[in-house]
Amino acid sequence: MRVEAIVEVRMTEDRGKVLKALENVFTPMRIEERQSDMGTILVATCEGHKCLEKLRSAIWRQGIQDAARSVISRGIVGEDTVVFSVNKQAAYVGVVSFVTEAGESPLGPITFTVKTNDVRQFIDWLAPRTYRGRVYYEAPPPD
């Protein structure tokens, strides 16, 4: 599994705070900086499921597996890719709030692109189905 997280650091934002927001939900192996008209773009990448453990833990801690599953499932692109976004400001305080519409996150979201051999297993691992608030199938970590 390969994961890429992209987040914009606007000119009015503190780079350290944006980096903290990213690292509250993601553990990157590498971070590259690219310049844009609006500021700097941070492109964080990693291989394997461990880099998404913080995101998964927050989803489980907040009890939002079903909502997360619904949003993430709508982001399936082709057979091996999932794209979804979380609110940068919420991530800064350790909370996961999914962004479902453009403009919903005024300072821009953190956008994840996950490439995996088994999209369904990835979703079952990150945000499994629940019944009456209890997970009834916990999938093993994806490739």
Curated annotation (Swiss-Prot):
Name of the protein described by the UniProt record: UPF0201 protein PAE1632
Classification via InterPro entries: PAB1135-like, Ribosomal_uL5_dom_sf
Family note: Belongs to the UPF0201 family.
Pfam families documented for this protein: RNA_binding (PF01877)
SUPFAM superfamilies: RL5-like
HAMAP family found in the cross-reference section: UPF0201
Superkingdom, natural source: Archaea
Gene3D superfamilies: 3.30.1440.10
